[in-house]
């Protein structure tokens, strides 16, 4: 979870 949980910023 966190920024790494999203495909891109």
From Swiss-Prot:
GO terms for cellular component: extracellular region. Expressed in the CNS and abdominal perisympathetic organs (aPSO). Not expressed in the ring gland, midgut or thoracic perisympathetic organs (tPSO) (at protein level). GO terms for biological process: neuropeptide signaling pathway. The modification Leucine amide is found at residue 9. Keywords: Amidation, Neuropeptide, Secreted. It comes from the Eukaryota. This is CAPA-Periviscerokinin-2. It comes from Delia radicum (Cabbage root fly). The lineage of its organism: Eukaryota, Metazoa, Ecdysozoa, Arthropoda, Hexapoda.
